[in-house]
Design a protein with these regions (language model features):
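N-terminal first-folded block
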Residues: 1-37
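Residue-level recognition of beta-strand microenvironments
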Residues: 9, 13, 46, 81-84
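A generic local secondary-structure boundary/capping motif
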Residues: 14-17, 44-46, 66-69
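A structural micro-motif recognizing beta-strand termini
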Residues: 30, 44-46, 60
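Short alpha-helix capping/helix-loop boundary micro-motifs
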Residues: 39-43
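C-terminal structural segments of small proteins and small subunits
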Residues: 56-92
Length: 92
């Protein structure tokens, strides 16, 4: 799973017919402390996430299994909205 923050939306007037009712969001991976890291990615929203929210994203075949997207051309799907992240660092 990828921890990420929603930073934008994607509008596609023409797309695969199986994605017509799907919302596409731009996400930026973050570390457990919320610091941005890695490249942006586009993911199908299955949980009605909003701008600025921290989310959980699955990719690959797991993304296609999320919320009935099995036969869709999807590589990343948002499957959870994160309320909090707690990290216990060694030595603290």
């Amino acid at each position: 799973m990828i921890l990420a923050r929603i930073v934008g939306t994607v509008v596609a007037t023409r797309k695969d017919p199986r994605l017509v009712s799907s919302k596409l969001l731009v996400a930026r991976p973050v570390d457990p402390h919320g610091k941005a890291e890695g490249s942006y990615l586009v993911a199908v929203d299955t949980v009605d996430a909003g701008f600025g929210e921290t989310v959980l994203i699955v990719s690959g075949s797991s993304a296609r299994m999320a919320s009935g997207l099995k036969d869709c051309p999807v590589d990343a799907a948002i499957v959870g909205i994160v309320d909090t992240v707690q990290v216990s660092e060694p030595g603290t």
